[in-house]
Structure formats: C-alpha cells, structure tokens
Amino acid sequence: LLEWFKRPEEPVSKPLPKSVIVAALVLAPLVLAFIAYSRPWYFNQSYLGGFLVFELMTAAVWMYRRVFFVLVIVAFLFAGIELPVGSVWTAGRWAILGVGALVGSSIMLRDRKYRIGWFHVLALFAVLAALVSAAVSRYSGLSSLKVLSLLTLFIYAGTGARVSAAGRENRFFAGLLTGCEVFVGAVGAAYLAGIEVMGNPNSLGAVMGVVGAPILLWGVLVSEETFPRRRRMALFVLAVYLTFASHARAGMVAAFISCGLLCMVLRKYRMLINGVVVLAILVAGAAVLRPEQFSNTVAALTDTVIFKGKDPSEGLLGSRLSPWQAAVDSIHKHFWFGTGFGTSDNGQDATESLGKFATVVAASSEHGSSYLAILSWVGMVGVLPFVLLMLVLLWKVIETVVWMRRTGNPYHPAVPLAMVILAGILHASLEDWLFAPGYYLCVFYWSVAFIFVDYVPALATAESRSVLFWRSRAIQPRLGEVAPSR
C-alpha cells in the first residue's frame, strides 16, 4: 500500500489521441449532414439565427464590460430596422436584455460599490405604477409583458450599462463616439444607395437629432488632431443633413437646441457663427442661381415640414391635433388608472392574439407625445413617478449645463450625455417613444440616462478648466478619478 502511495501522480486530463481527433473531424460533417437530411427544420433561418444569437451572447457575457452594451444596442437596432436580419432579433433582443440585466445585477451585488439613489428608487416606483395600470387594463396580459420589458430595461440600465462605463470611461466614451461615426456613415451610405434602413422618416430624424448630431459635435470639440476633427465634422454635417432630409420637425428641434446650447455654454461662438454663415451662403446661392427651383423647394418644404401636408389654417401643429385629441379623450375615459402600460383601448377582443415580442396595431395607437402617452397608459394615479423621473433628469442636465458654462470644459463624461438627455426630452414631446422599451432609441436613451446620473455628482470636484477629464487619443486612467460616486 505504501508503494502505491509513492507512485507518481498521473495527470487529471490526458491529451486526446490523434486518432480520436481525426475521427471526430471526419465524422462531424457526416453527422451534421445526416441531421440536416433527417431533420431539416433544425437548419432553417430561425434555428440558425437563434444559434448565432446564443454564440454572440455567450461571447459577450465572457467580455461583459467591454462588449455587452454594444450587443444590446445592436440587437434592438437590428430588430427595428428594415433589413432581412430583423426577424431573428425580434425575440432574441429580449433574451439578450434579460441576460444583460441578470449578469449586471450579479456584478453589482458582488462588487457592492455602486451607488443607489433617488433616481433608481423612482425608476422602481415607475415600474410598480405601470404594473398597477396593467392589472386593470383591458389587455392585462399584453400590458404585463410590456411592464416586464420596462422592468428588464431599467434593471439592465441600472446595473449592466453602469458597469460597462464605470472605471473604464475613456474606452467607453471613445467607443461611443466611434460607434456614432460608424452608424451615421452607414446610414448615410444606405440612403445614398436608396435604402431607407431606418424604416420611416421619423425614426431617421429621431436617431440623428437625439444621438448622432450632439455626440458628433461633442466629438469635434474634444478632438485634438486635425484628421479626426475634420472626419467628425463631416459626419456631423451628414447627421444634420439626414435630420433635415427626414422632414421630422421633432428631430430638427432636438438637434438645433442641443447643438446650439452645447456651443453657447462652451463659448464656441465662432463655430456657431461659422455654421450659420455657411448655411446662409448656401441658401442665398441657391436662391440666386436657381430662383424658380428655390421657390418651389421652399414651398414644398413649407408644406411637408412645417404643416405636414395639413391645411395651413390649422396652425403649425395641425398634424398633431388629431393624435393629441385622441390621447386627451383616452385620458378622460380612463382618468385614474389609464388603459394599461403600453396599450390603448381600441375595442379589440382581449382574447385574441395581440403579439408577444413586438407591438401590434390592434392594441396601440399614436399619441403624438411621449408624455401624453404615459399619462394615457397609467392614468393620474400612476404618472407621478414618471414625472419625477423626468424632472430629476432635467435637473441633472441643468447642473451639467451650469458647470459647462462656468468652466468651459467639454472633457467630462457628463457633457455629451447631458446633450443627449436634453435632446431626448425635447424630441419626446412630439413623438411617443420615450417609454416604449422595445424601441432601440428608448433602450439607448435610458441606458445612457442611468450612466449620466452617476457622473453628475462628480462635477462638484471637477472645477478646474485646465484638467482634461477625457482624451480622444491615448487611453488614460485619469478619468477613473472622476468616476461615479460610489
């Protein structure tokens, strides 16, 4: 027995013989071919797409902080654009968001260094208010699913999105800026080729006016080298052009106010004046060289952009009067608890199939404003947490703008996010996407909103103009010094 104990230990895992490896390489294609012949439904688009999503999700979980935020945004974006890949992501996006929320929550519970404040408490109360409205809704099942999607989004935004940015701000914001460049360039190339990838003009105006234009303008301001600055300026001009080409007034207003305010508070008056002068020269040149065509263009733009094809006697917002009136009527009819979060009482039979992974027309309607939509959905009883949530965001934006005006410093993580939040608040007053968790812009907006709330408290210790809190070139650890308060 003693000799047996003295024997050298054998390795726990031995390398596989070469013959086994060769046999596996030979037999694997044959097995796959047999399965494809005997069970061809395993190789249809849905199964293969689901397998691809599973692979991507597994890899993203392995590199959670670096990759998962991008995967979530891409999944919801692909589910909403007019491309063949959209069908695979319609259901897969919810699995990705759920896994992201679960893993993000686990990381936060493990690290125990992330701050929970009033904003996060209000988000929880907003979900509870939505759940109450779903309980009394005509379409209780569908509304409950939408509440679940809102809860999942808020959990991911409050955990996974914050984890993706905290402690690695340089990489996160460099990636955010690069992602905007790629996205705007790709959308511009697609529209040049005649492909309307965003589906409808309002969506194009929304993403360009709320996200593309303010972030790219900020990228121009923080660029330290000539070529990146010129590239971002060209893409910013493209984003502004696409916003105007969409004829979406909400997108134009959001882009104009957010970008104009960014230049004003950072004292970039020369850039603002140069932009106005260039635009005036282009307009004047077109009027002089082709007066008749210019006159026709102005008349067409007045009809399609300002009045949206409605009678001018109805006023500037004539196209919004009908959905606004319908929303007000719905609020009067369901005053206290609303029609149920994410649903409208259109008289559709509640026993019929109303969809599980995407919104259907039978249980929804246009409200013309995100704020009228949420009031119609949850009623007077449930709207207070949502109102307070938006007021907290607006106050954080004001704090950031005051700091920007005092220091003139664009090198802080809160600066671009504040402009996106402000643009979203303005845009949502004319479009009802702000509380639609299946919409890619809603997912992006609330993700960066939770990140933004983390960085505003750090402004109190970031008073010096000479300190650069973010650099567009070398990845530096200095921004970690102004990481969110924990």
Put a short name on every predicted segment:
Residues V74, G80-G86, S369-V378, N409-V453:
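Membrane helix-loop boundary segments at the extracytoplasmic
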Residues L30, F54-A60, V127-A134, T152-R267, ...:
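Alpha-helical transmembrane segments of multi-pass inner-membrane proteins
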Residues F34-Y47, P84-G92, S140-K146, E196-A206, ...:
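Helix-loop-helix junctions and helix-breaking kinks within/between transmembrane helices
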